[in-house]
Amino acid sequence: MYMNNNSKVLALKYRPQTFDDLIGQEVVAETITNSIKADKIPNAYLFTGIRGIGKTTIARIVAKTLNCSNGIENKCKVKCENCDSIASSNHIDVLEMDAASKTGVDDVRDLIEFSRYGPTSAKYKIFIIDEVHMLSKQAFNALLKTLEEPPEYLKFIFATTEIKKIPITVVSRCQRFDLSRIKSSELFEFIKKIKDKENGKITDDALRLIVKILSLIHISEPTRP
C-alpha cells in the first residue's frame, strides 16, 4: 500500500491516545472512565486479550487519564506535560516493564523498592507490566503483598495473553477487563480514515481484503479465558 512519504510509522502516528480514539472497546472505556470520575479506582487493572488487541495502548491511556493535569473531563485532549511524557514512555512516575524479559524476583523487588517513594510530578505512580503471566512464582509472591496493601499513590496495570498462568491470588486483587475482538466493519472504517488522511492509493476492495486477512489472523489466535 502506497502512502505519502512520512518519517513517522503509521502504526505509531495513529495509535489511540485517548479513550475516545479506541475502536471496539467502548464498554471498557466507559467503565474505566466512570470509575475514575466516581473516584473508585482499583489498586490494579488487568487487561486480557489476544496479541495486538490494544492492551498496552489502553494501559497507557489509563495512566494518562489518572495523571492528566487537566482532569478527567478533559479526556487527555488538551496538551498536558504528564500525558505527553506518558505517551512517549518518558514519564518518571510511570514505569513500563516487559515481564517476558524481566521475569525474576529481583526485577519485581526493584519495582517494590521504587514504589516506596511517592510520585515526583504526577498524582499517581503507575507500574505497567506487560506479559505479566511470564513472571516467576517467586516474583508473583514478592508482588502480592504490595498489591494487597499498596500506598494510595501507587497503581498497577497488568496486560496478558495468558490469564490462566496468573495466580488467582493476583487476579482476584485486580479489576479485570477482557478486551473484545474488533469487528471487521469497525476495522475497515478505521483503516479507510487513515488511507484518506494519508492520500493512500488503494481501493476500498483492497482495504476489505486487508481487513479480511487481519480478521483471519485474529481468528487463528486462540482465546484464553
Where do the PLM segments sit?
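Residue-level detector of conserved catalytic or cofactor/ligand-binding positions
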Residues: 215-225
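Aromatic/hydrophobic pocket-lining residues that form π-stacking "cages" and hydrophobic walls in ligand
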Residues: 59, 191, 210, 219
